[in-house]
């Protein structure tokens, strides 16, 4: 298990962003016929925002199922969200929802595939995040 877990729809936008990060990552299955993913270590979740801007259905059902597993939920340490600025106020709202429900920091948000600058910021930010977490006394 890596320190990144992500979900990507058939559009593959989030998958392409994660691939550009060049970091090990585990993907939450798209289809219910695929094996269920169980987290084995602390991780940051990268998730797209669904919906048309009203916030309803913003968190993909597959992500909800993944986080409803007590073991998976207990290991999430932060969230990064993708979205579409056309959603207005609901831009990347899936990150807000997950951060609030799981009581974890909302680390970053980016649009669609993300820019090269987004990739750099996330890669560097994750490095700092895990370093800081390693310095927290148990």
Curated annotation (Swiss-Prot):
Family: Belongs to the NrdI family.
Purpose of the protein: Probably involved in ribonucleotide reductase function.
GO molecular function, one term: FMN binding
Protein name: Protein NrdI
HAMAP family found in the cross-reference section: NrdI (MF_00128)
Organism this protein belongs to: Beutenbergia cavernae (strain ATCC BAA-8 / DSM 12333 / CCUG 43141 / JCM 11478 / NBRC 16432 / NCIMB 13614 / HKI 0122)
Biological process per Gene Ontology, one example term: protein modification process
Lineage, opening ranks: Bacteria, Bacillati, Actinomycetota, Actinomycetes, Micrococcales
């Amino acid at each position: 298990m890596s320190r990144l877990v992500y979900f990507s729809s058939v559009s593959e936008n989030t998958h392409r962003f994660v691939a550009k990060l060049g970091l090990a990552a585990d993907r939450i299955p798209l289809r219910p016929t695929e094996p269920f993913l169980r987290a084995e270590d602390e991780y940051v979740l990268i998730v797209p925002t669904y919906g048309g801007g009203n916030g309803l259905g913003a968190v993909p059902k597959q992500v909800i199922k993944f986080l409803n597993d007590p073991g998976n939920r207990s290991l999430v340490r932060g969230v990064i969200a993708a979205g579409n600025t056309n959603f207005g106020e609901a831009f990347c709202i899936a990150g807000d929802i997950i951060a609030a429900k799981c009581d974890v920091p909302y680390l970053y948000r980016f649009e669609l595939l993300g820019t090269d600058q987004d990739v750099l910021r996330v890669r560097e930010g994750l490095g700092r995040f895990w370093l800081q977490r390693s310095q927290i006394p148990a």
